[in-house]
C-alpha cells in the first residue's frame, strides 16, 4: 500500500524522470556557487565591457581646444599698446631684421627685361606670366590672414610689430609682381586675365582656396594656422622661386630675378617668424597633424608645377622639381621641431648658392642682402666720443 505522502506518478512519468539530466544533477555543496555562463556569453560580455571601456577612454582622450588663457601669445595683454620694456627679445629681433630689409618696387630696374622678354620662347613667357599671376594674388591672401586673424589674435606687442611690418612688405611684393605683369604684358585683355588669376586660372584657384579655407576655419587652432601659412610662404612659393632662380642661372630677366631675390629673402624671414611663433606656443598641434598639413601643401605645389603649370616649359626637370619641394618641406619640418618626412637631398645645385640673405646680383649695382643703415646697430654704436687715440 502506497504512503499518502508519496507522490503519485505514472510509469511513463517515472521513465521520463529516469532519462532526464535533472536526475543526475547534484546540488550538494553548491549553495554559494554563481551561475555559470556559456563560452559565447562570456566572450560577448568581455567584448561589451571592452567597447564601453574603449569609448570611455576615447572620450577622455578627445582633443580639446586649448584655452586662450593658457597661451601667453594669445591671452589678454593690457600692455599691448606700449612697446617697451621688451619681453620677447627673440621676436623683437625678428622685427628689427624685417625693418632693416625694407625696400620698394621703384628700386628694381626693369629696363633690361623688355629685351629679354621678347627673346623668350612662347612657353617660357607663358610660364613666367602665370607664376607672376599666382604671386600677385597670393600676397593679398597672406595679408588677408594677417589683418583678419593673426594681428587680432596675437596680444604680444613685439609680434604685432612684426605682423604690421609684414603687411607692408606683402603689399610691396604684390605691387612688384603687378608692376612686372604690367611691364611685360602689353595686351590689356591678357593683363586682366592674369590680374584675376584666382578666378580665371583653376591651378591658381586651387592653391588660393586651400589658403583661404584656413583663414575662415573657426575650429582650427592658432598653432595649426601658423603651420598652414608657414607652408603657404615656405612651400607654395618655393618651386616658383626656384624656377625664377633657374632663369637667373641662364642670365635672363635681370629685373625679375633681382626682385625674386629680395622677395624670397623676405618670405624666408616670414616663414622663420612663423616657426618662432610656433615654438612659443604652450599647446602645439601634434606631429601627425603638422605632417598632415605639410604633406597636403606639398601635394598641391607638386601638382601645380608639374601638371598644371609644368616647369618643363622653361627647361626644368619636373621630377627634380617634385624632389626640391619635398626637400623644402623637410627643412620646414625641422624648423618646426619635428622629424623629416621625405628625407631627400636638394636636387638643384644652383639653389645651394642662394641663401635667404641673398647674394650679389651680377646684373645689379645693388645687392640683395642690403639692409638699412643703422637699423640693426645698438644705440651705443652711433654715439660720438672724443676719446680716440691719435
UniProtKB/Swiss-Prot annotation:
The entry's comment on post-translational modification says: Phosphorylation on Ser-20 relieves the inhibitory effect on Wnt signaling. Phosphorylated on Thr-33 by CDK1 and CDK2; predominantly in G2 and M phase. Ubiquitinated by the SCF(CCNF) E3 ubiquitin-protein ligase complex; leading to its degradation by the proteasome.
Q: Which PROSITE patterns match?
A: RIBORED_SMALL
User: How are cofactors bound according to the entry's free-text note?
Assistant: Binds 2 iron ions per subunit.
Residues reported to bind Fe cation 1 = 139, 170, 173, 267
Q: Which GO terms describe its cellular component?
A: cytosol; nuclear envelope; ribonucleoside-diphosphate reductase complex
Q: What is its EC number?
A: 1.17.4.1
The cofactor(s) it depends on are:
Fe cation
What does the record note on quaternary structure? Heterodimer of a large and a small subunit. Interacts (via Cy motif and when phosphorylated at Thr-33) with CCNF; the interaction occurs exclusively in G2 and early M.
Recorded protein name is: Ribonucleoside-diphosphate reductase subunit M2
Q: Which gene encodes it?
A: Rrm2
